[in-house]
Amino acid sequence: MSWQDFLARHQVGDVIEGVVTDQVPFGSFVEAEGFTGLAPGQSWPAGTRVSVRILAMDPDRQRFSLAPA
């Protein structure tokens, strides 16, 4: 899936499923549909499957922010 496809399929507020790829001091990175977003303040261990809500999308930088669903 391309980034443009991701943007066409999803909008802020959508709930998606993903897998935590990394935990850092400021949050957890979650891969969903081939793209990685940041869940600030979350401390999920790598490999955990999570349901997350899209909080914000940055089309130019191909980034998105997430929160627990």
Task: Set out the residue ranges of the language-model regions.
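Single-stranded RNA-binding regions, centering on S1/OB-family and related RNA-binding modules
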Residues: 1-69
